[in-house]
From Swiss-Prot:
Gene: mnmG
Organism: Bartonella bacilliformis (strain ATCC 35685 / KC583 / Herrer 020/F12,63)
Keyword Cytoplasm: yes
An annotated Gene Ontology molecular function: flavin adenine dinucleotide binding
Keyword entries, A-Z: Cytoplasm, FAD, Flavoprotein, NAD, tRNA processing
Protein name as it appears in the record: tRNA uridine 5-carboxymethylaminomethyl modification enzyme MnmG
Function: NAD-binding protein involved in the addition of a carboxymethylaminomethyl (cmnm) group at the wobble position (U34) of certain tRNAs, forming tRNA-cmnm(5)s(2)U34.
Keyword set includes Cytoplasm: yes
GO cellular component labels: cytosol
PROSITE patterns: GIDA_1, GIDA_2
Amino acid sequence: MQSYDVIIVGGGHAGCEAASASARTGARTALVTYRLSDMGTMSCNPAIGGLGKGHLVREIDALDGLMGRAADFAGIQFRLLNRRKGPAVRGPRTQADRQLYKKAIQKLLREQDNLFIIEDEVVDIIVKNNRVSGVFLKNQGNIFSGAVVLTTGTFLNGLIHIGDKTWPAGRMGEQASVQLAERLKNYGISFGRLKTGTPARLSKKTIRWDVLPKQQADEDPVPFSFLTEKIKQPQIECAITRTNAQTHHIISENIHRSALYSGAIEGVGPRYCPSIEDKIIKFGERDGHQIFLEPEGLEDDVIYPNGISTSLPEDVQISLLKTIEGLENVNVLQPGYAIEYDFINPQYLSKTLELRSLPGLFLAGQINGTTGYEEAAAQGLLAGLNAARQVGGLDEIILSRSTAYIGVMIDDLISRGVCEPYRMFTSRAEFRLSLRADNADARLTPLAQEWGIVSHKRWTCYQNKQQRLDHARSICQKLFLTPNEASAHGLQINNDGVRRSAYSLLSYPNMNVARLTDFWPQLHSIDAKTVESLEIEAQYAVYLERQKQDIAALQRDESLEIPSSLNIQAIYGLSNELKTKIQKISPRSIADAQKIDGMTPAALSLIITYIQRQRREKGKLA
């Protein structure tokens, strides 16, 4: 009889991170996947990171996960998005060579102690005494465990649509998980349907690259992993093209043949990654939509046309593509398609990602209503970690909204649910000044060390980095200038007689360590990476102190009761939409009000201030 502590179902991004995290705790872990060769496959776009998503990858890496290291190994076009904006909203991103990425993930999994990889299909879960105790495999029968993590992606009752053609599949060329979906319903688990889509794949050789503008990689690529010292793969360029009036005419004339508009698809698609049909219908006034032509690998003939996903019939896809500049003679290697799949309302989960109605069953990834590799991987890590800790009799791990973007995402999912695929953005985090991509290790690696999931190499690397930063900070805090001394060097500060440290001067606009070396040459000894960390820390110091107070105040206010007599209509500045929702839901506390869909920190502040003012006025009357 095969027995493990934790079984992971699925070898996608969520499953790989779940398996690694579980095994790193010391738990005997099994990862069950259809095909060993498909572990870590990038099913859709050949890219990792982006706005909000890049923060998740950095956090996964800070917790010693896999995605950041694999992306650095496979990255072929690194770009730091929002580079000109503040550090809090900068988003690391890279295009990745599909084959190299998969190779990196599989290597990391093969090298992981306590991890056993099984090639088979899970067709049922085993439940004893209302608790999951294993899975049933199609070929090998029962295997048992203390907990199971389901990471089925788009495979659970997956259905591909191309025009009027529909067939069961998890992704193109792979079977759907139909039997498992039916068996799960027998345990009282109810499902919804979501949809996502992918564009056609094009032959690189048949594109007129010479007529198209290019997008270059950054000259100084910023890696994802705190362990990566240098990006080693050659950096490539992409090309940019656009749809046009002729493209739009073809789509409009054939919109009835799109699976999305014919009524064949019932699932809701991702708002922030619409199909080209949606773009034409919803933004008909635009004369064109941008398309990025992204190579899928260094030695690959396949091009991913980012921005033109579709479920139109194949003949229509070919026609519309040939109207686009540079693609007049393009050869389509694989048509675009939409895929529908089952998901579970994440409000049925606890914050450990365990299904409340079926103890021992944890869920991660698209089965929870999210979209994207990064969102899936982050959930997988937390689900695998909590599954292993539960089996080991250890306390559960819950990341708060003020600690990590992972905490923001999980709290959003559990408290608000989803009506469309959930995507991470920096705007979702109310404490984003402290949840930066650059300080993910400072926030999370010490926690991961406490949980026992960090390698000796990473912990040593982290300690060395912090020691360098502490030393540099100490130097800067001991160096002082008077306003007169600053003025003599061309630096204008308030002439108030107050001596200022080099550290405090770094918070001034357009100030940096390089400029301060004119006053203090000893600052030349600080290495470039430490300088960057020091400058960001100093720039945000005042704001972060204020944010700490806001976090502490919010934590105090969460327990504040909302009186049933509260006249919500009297709160000035609150939107009518929120007033209606509050009246309907009648939250009993600020913590309950936080969970209302659309609730913002600003709105909560208005409610808290109003309640506190009402209490003070009542106190005066008494």
